[in-house]
């Protein structure tokens, strides 16, 4: 017996000694790397949040009419639960990092789709992503490029220009004197990503058992589809070159060039381009950059991507969109960064989406219903129209291009996001998957416009309408062999674009009493182009 005890003690001592040596020698070891720690933290946070929601209305039978009525109002107790839960979720994302931060950022971008308590709390994740050490950065570069940093670069800044959920960017100078930006993937994120997504899927399914009306599987599906693409930096480089070629006619757009000879799946080398963030009004004022011009350029660029090309940069948060004065011409320029996340729209989706926006802009409510339902909205088409435009249903009915959004309307929309959360989550589960990233992109762009004070101008809607007209005309011409029919389509396109120009001219002089009468006459003589 004593011999067995001695043997057990010896083996235990050896195991502890080996563990001690491993822990001491492995400089990159972090408790967060252990699956049990990450899983335990996620399960515990989900359980606490679920318990908080379940007990907030413990005196009211769950699922009863009274429960639904209380929940549908902005009841102070529920607002407090939203806030507590959002903070817990934010802490979980910061602790587990990587994929969790990426998903948290996605949720934080959905300003008009989720309760404000969640979006305002989770927005900090865009600026609080944890940083990899220089030892880890050197390790990734050594493994992927087969050389040390000093062999590749004349100089390399240890302090990153920016840190995101999946990677961080450093400024460096090549031996030939060219200044470059070096994007390096966090070393552990790729290995953890598939396990993290599986964990999220299990937790979302568990929460659905407790709260059947809340359907968030769309979020897991999106992460499962997009994360592998975002983790492949060669794919990001290809996207950058594609969008640069696609939008080459916009002289205000700058996409940094890729250095393919020093790029891998985890390291991306690109031309270094300096500038201020697109929501930084002070930077624009100091550099004499016209805020309204930048807002118009941004709207033109994204309308072209969505309606004409169907290839959309889906992460336009301010850190990924810079502005600057072109060093040669002195003209204002938009610098588009981070090309890891793009959405390729099918032709059917793109054309239906064009028709829907034309209907919304020109207040054709019959077609709003028709094309919303074609895009999967069903009987919830009024809510879907409000989600797309971030306007109230009254404003949609009156015409979203007739008046800009007011502070009162904006507050009403944000409050309704909490009130209609089950219906919103139902819609997000039933619309085409392509729509999810488009909605996220729309909300990020609105956030930029709100920061610049240029949101929802009539001019921006007219620019969208121009792109829709061009896209629909191009589709019709592509599907006919008749020269006469193609000529007819081209004439109709030119006439509809002329209407848009005339409408825009009238809006510029709308302060005159005569303008309203002229506008009414024009709208009566020339129906909305669809």
Swiss-Prot record:
**Which UniProt keywords are listed?**
ATP-binding, Kinase, Mitochondrion, Nucleotide-binding, Serine/threonine-protein kinase, Transferase, Transit peptide
> Which EC number(s) are documented for this chain?
2.7.-.-
Tell me if RNA-binding is a UniProt keyword of this record.
Answer: no
Its subcellular locations are: Mitochondrion
Q: Name one GO molecular function term.
A: ATP binding
Q: Does the keyword Mitochondrion apply?
A: yes
**Top EC class of this enzyme:** transferase
Q: Name one GO cellular component term.
A: mitochondrial inner membrane
Q: Name one GO biological process term.
A: positive regulation of cristae formation
Question: Which InterPro entries did the record assign?
Answer: ABC1_dom, ADCK1_dom, Kinase-like_dom_sf, Mito_struct-func_regulator
Q: Output the Gene3D superfamilies linked to this UniProt entry.
A: Transferase(Phosphotransferase) domain 1
Q: Where is the Protein kinase domain?
A: 155-467
Similarity comment text for this entry = Belongs to the protein kinase superfamily. ADCK protein kinase family.
Biological role: Appears to be essential for maintaining mitochondrial cristae formation and mitochondrial function by acting via YME1L1 in a kinase-independent manner to regulate essential mitochondrial structural proteins OPA1 and IMMT. The action of this enzyme is not yet clear. It is not known if it has protein kinase activity and what type of substrate it would phosphorylate (Ser, Thr or Tyr).
Q: Under which name does UniProt file this protein?
A: AarF domain-containing protein kinase 1
Which species?
Homo sapiens
Question: Gene that codes for this?
Answer: ADCK1
């Amino acid at each position: 017996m004593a011999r067995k005890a001695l043997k057990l003690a010896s083996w235990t001592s050896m195991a502890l000694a080996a563990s001690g040596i491993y822990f001491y020698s492995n400089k990159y070891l972090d408790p967060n790397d252990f699956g049990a720690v990450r899983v335990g933290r996620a399960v515990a946070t989900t359980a606490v949040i679920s318990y908080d929601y379940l007990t907030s209305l413990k005196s009211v039978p769950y699922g009863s009419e009274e429960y639904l009525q209380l929940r549908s109002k902005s009841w102070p107790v529920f607002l407090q639960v939203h806030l507590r839960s959002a903070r817990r979720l934010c802490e979980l994302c910061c602790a587990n990092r990587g994929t969790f931060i990426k998903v948290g950022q996605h949720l934080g971008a959905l300003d008009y789709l989720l309760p404000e308590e969640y979006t305002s709390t989770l927005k900090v994740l865009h600026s609080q992503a944890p940083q990899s050490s220089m030892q880890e950065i050197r390790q990734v570069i050594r493994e992927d490029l087969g050389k040390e940093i000093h062999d590749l670069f004349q100089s390399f800044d240890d302090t990153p220009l920016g840190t995101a959920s999946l990677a961080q960017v450093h400024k460096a100078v090549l031996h030939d004197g060219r200044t470059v930006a070096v994007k390096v993937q966090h070393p552990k994120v790729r290995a953890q990503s598939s396990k993290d997504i599986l964990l999220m899927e299990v937790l979302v399914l568990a929460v659905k058992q407790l709260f059947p009306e809340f359907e968030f599987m769309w979020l897991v599906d999106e992460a499962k589809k997009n994360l592998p693409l975002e983790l492949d930096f060669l794919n990001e480089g290809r996207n950058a070159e594609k969008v640069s070629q696609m939008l080459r006619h916009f002289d205000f757009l700058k996409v940094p060039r890729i250095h393919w000879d020093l790029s891998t799946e985890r390291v991306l080398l690109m031309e270094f381009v300096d500038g201020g963030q697109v929501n930084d009004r002070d930077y624009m004022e100091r550099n004499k950059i016209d805020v309204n011009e930048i807002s118009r350029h941004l709207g033109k660029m994204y309308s072209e991507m969505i309606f004409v090309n169907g290839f959309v940069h889906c992460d336009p948060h301010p850190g990924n969109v810079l502005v600057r004065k072109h060093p040669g011409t002195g003209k204002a320029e938009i610098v588009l960064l981070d090309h890891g996340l793009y959405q390729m729209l099918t032709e059917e989706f793109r054309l239906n989406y064009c028709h829907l926006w034309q209907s919304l802009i020109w207040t054709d409510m019959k077609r709003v219903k028709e094309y919303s339902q074609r895009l999967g909205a069903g009987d919830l088409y009024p809510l879907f129209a409000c989600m797309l435009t971030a306007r109230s249903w009254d404003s949609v009915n009156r015409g979203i291009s007739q008046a800009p959004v007011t502070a009162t309307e904006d507050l009403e929309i944000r409050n309704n996001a909490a009130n209609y959360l089950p219906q919103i989550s139902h819609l997000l589960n039933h619309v085409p998957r392509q729509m999810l990233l488009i909605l996220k992109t729309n909300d990020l762009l609105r956030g930029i416009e709100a920061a610049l004070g240029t949101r929802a101008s009539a001019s921006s809607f007219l620019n969208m309408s121009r792109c829709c007209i061009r896209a629909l005309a191009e589709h019709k011409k592509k599907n006919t062999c008749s020269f006469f029919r193609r000529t007819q389509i081209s004439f109709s396109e030119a006439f509809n674009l002329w209407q848009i120009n005339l409408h825009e001219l009238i809006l510029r002089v709308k302060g005159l009493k005569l303008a309203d009468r002229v506008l009414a006459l024009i709208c009566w003589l020339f129906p909305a182009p669809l």
